[in-house]
Amino acid sequence: MERIMLKSKIHRATITGADLEYEGSITIDRDLMDAADIVSYEKVAVWDVTNGSRLETYAIEGERGSGVICLNGAAARLVAPKDVVIIASFVNMSNQAAIKHEPKLVFVDGKNRMLPTRAEEAGQARVRCVH
């Protein structure tokens, strides 16, 4: 059996542009792509935290160190500059490999600069639920 697992994500990146006239894709700062192990033309999911939209596209390389996160083509209609997004990539792997798998998590600040690596917190760990 194979499972589809989160390979990596860039968490809470800020959209820097939306170019409707470009042919498609999402332009991502090359440093962020490297940190998240995303290569050019790799399929990625983009989840807009600001407005709830979700889409799939492919990544293309942006200028290293620029902080660029720009949705291109039709997807540009689903986001706006300053929206906060999560960019995720996935991988197929065996059940045995999935049990040991650790995704690469890249956390960024409001200018898309990398923050120190840390473990991801479950949502319930951040908010106390009252029954």
Swiss-Prot record:
Keywords: Autocatalytic cleavage, Cytoplasm, Decarboxylase, Lyase, Pantothenate biosynthesis, Pyruvate, Schiff base, Zymogen. The keyword Cell division does not apply. One of its GO terms (cellular component) is cytosol. Its cofactor is pyruvate. The modification Pyruvic acid (Ser) is found at residue 25. One of its GO terms (biological process) is alanine biosynthetic process. InterPro entries: Asp_de-COase-like_dom_sf (IPR009010), Asp_decarbox (IPR003190). Belongs to the PanD family. This is Aspartate 1-decarboxylase. Substrate binds at residues 57, 73-75. The active site is at residues 25, 58. One of its GO terms (molecular function) is aspartate 1-decarboxylase activity. Catalyzes the pyruvoyl-dependent decarboxylation of aspartate to produce beta-alanine. It comes from Pelobacter propionicus (strain DSM 2379 / NBRC 103807 / OttBd1). Is synthesized initially as an inactive proenzyme, which is activated by self-cleavage at a specific serine bond to produce a beta-subunit with a hydroxyl group at its C-terminus and an alpha-subunit with a pyruvoyl group at its N-terminus. Pathway: Cofactor biosynthesis; (R)-pantothenate biosynthesis; beta-alanine from L-aspartate: step 1/1. Heterooctamer of four alpha and four beta subunits. It catalyses: L-aspartate + H(+) = beta-alanine + CO2. It is found in: Cytoplasm. The gene is panD. The lineage of its organism: Bacteria, Pseudomonadati, Thermodesulfobacteriota, Desulfuromonadia, Desulfuromonadales. Binds 1 pyruvoyl group covalently per subunit. Its EC number is 4.1.1.11. Coiled coil: none annotated. It comes from the Bacteria.
